[in-house]
Each structure stands twice: as C-alpha cells, then as structure tokens.
Design a protein with these regions (language model features):
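A short coil-to-beta-strand element that immediately follows conserved catalytic motifs
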Residues: 56-65
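Conserved N-terminal beta-strand and adjoining loop/helix that marks the start
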Residues: 1-18, 66
Length: 130
C-alpha cells in the first residue's frame, strides 16, 4: 500500500484564535499542513508548511497527536504539533498554489465554519481549552 506522511501546525494567538487556512479545492477550513519532504523531520515540515501557507514563522512546542487513516487506498499519517508564532506577517507564499485564504478563527467560529477535516474539530477545541 502506498504511504504518505505529513505534518500540521496548531497555532493559537493571544486572543485564543486558531490559525486556519482554506484551499481552492476544499469547501472547508483546516490548520496549515502538508507533506514531509525527503530529509525533513515532521517538526521541520510543520514549521515550513505554516510559513508557506500563512506567512508566519513558528516554533514547535510539542507533538499533540498522530492521525492515521486510509484515503483512496493510501495509508496517511499526519503528525499534529502545537506551535507558537514567533515572527513573520500574514501572507500566503504557497509554492503549490493551493492555499487561497488564511485567517484566525475564534472558538465560536470554529463551531460554525465548514471544516475540511471535521474529525479534527475535537482536537482543536481541546487545544483552546488548555
């Protein structure tokens, strides 16, 4: 079976909002994420993807989840990290040209927006409660 591994960054600002992105081919929002490149650690992938998709520099605080699933016959492993914004400014610089919007979403917005990965909502809400 073919395998794919990626990383996702959960970044919460001082207003208790989560940084989310929307891609042109999705009806929903998701945390910044993407595939691990050759020679890259999951942590390095997370930092790179957040920068590319949102413009923000982040540092990894801790790994908080690993999601394993099968999508269209591909074994998918996604590493989730809690990250902290340390610099940069908002601006999408996605080399894949997939991300069309990045925004901070509040707790009330998280409960009402469409999610690209609805199964992640519980994890996001848990992170806001910490």
């Amino acid at each position: 079976m073919e395998r794919w591994s990626g990383s996702a960054g959960i970044c919460i600002n001082e207003k208790m909002e989560i940084l989310m992105v929307k891609s042109f081919d999705s009806q929903g929002w998701a945390v910044p994420s993407g595939g691990i490149e050759e020679g890259e650690t999951p942590e390095e992938c997370c930092v790179r993807e957040v920068k590319e998709e949102t413009g923000y520099d982040v540092k990894v605080i801790e790994q908080i989840n690993v999601k394993r699933t099968i999508i269209k016959g591909i074994q998918v492993t996604t590493y989730y990290f809690r990250v902290e914004k340390i610099g940069g400014s908002s601006g999408i610089n996605d080399p894949d040209k997939i991300i069309v919007e990045a925004d901070w979403k509040s707790l009330s917005e998280l409960k009402t927006i469409d999610h690209a990965y609805p199964e992640d909502l519980e994890l996001l809400l848990e992170q806001l409660e910490q």
